[in-house]
Amino acid sequence: MVGDLVAKLHAFAEVGQVILTRNIPDYDEVVAAENTLIIQNTSPKGFGANHNVAFAHATAPYFCVLNPDIELPANPFPALLAALNSGSASVLAPAVVNSAGRPEDSARHFPTPLRLAAKLLGGHDGRYVLIPTQGPTPVDWVAGMFMLFRAQDFKAIGGFDEQFFLYYEDVDICTRLWKAGRPVMVCPQMQVMHDAQRASRKNWQFMKWHAASMARYFWKHWGRLPRRSVS
């Protein structure tokens, strides 16, 4: 799976460098290729820490955070880069759908206790309704499975907060970008595929990480969410 994704990325003219982090030794074989850097961790790091290390090796004016289980039916980068270059967004994401073509919850409103309670009771879960014909649209936050940053803005904001081991690091960095006046947007016209693995609903350790990250996010941003929370 990872090898196929790396090969596909190298086929895109817009991709000048691929940085792959082996956090645990269970990836399939990735054939060494020009402009591919493989970082082998001696012990597992968190999501944010891994991407901060990767960014330290990145040389391009754009930095893409990409999960290895993302599938790219078409090259998303021409449209995404054109949208970044023509607007003010600091980070841009495509719309994410599952294998059945149904939208994933990859662009959402900032979490609040009220919104979380509504979700638990079967109400609205905070996701945006994205229309494929829409142009780039401001949203509160986009999921870390696919985030295309302006490298200068990622650096200026200090990258991911490594105190989030797993979960909420994407919400946190988008919150900090909005607070700094750096917009977060999604491009509904461009779609990628992802089948979410809700590990936090199945594994006790992931549940603990999820709860700890949620608590840290609310402690860090409680009462201090950006004034510009888009509807």
Enumerate the language-model features and the residues they cover.
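Conserved donor NDP-sugar-binding/catalytic core segment of glycosyltransferases
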Residues: 74-105
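A short, conserved alpha-helix in the catalytic core of glycosyltransferases
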Residues: 140-158, 162-191
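Short, well-formed alpha-helical segments that are part of the catalytic scaffolds
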Residues: 1-12
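Active-site-adjacent helix/loop segment of glycosyltransferases
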Residues: 168, 175-231
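Short, flexible, basic/aromatic active-site loop/helix in glycosyltransferases
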Residues: 111-140
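Glycine-rich, basic loop-to-helix element that forms the pyrophosphate-binding segment
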Residues: 41-58
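Short aromatic/hydrophobic "clamp" motif used to bind/position activated sugar donors
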Residues: 63
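A conserved acidic beta->alpha catalytic loop
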Residues: 20-29
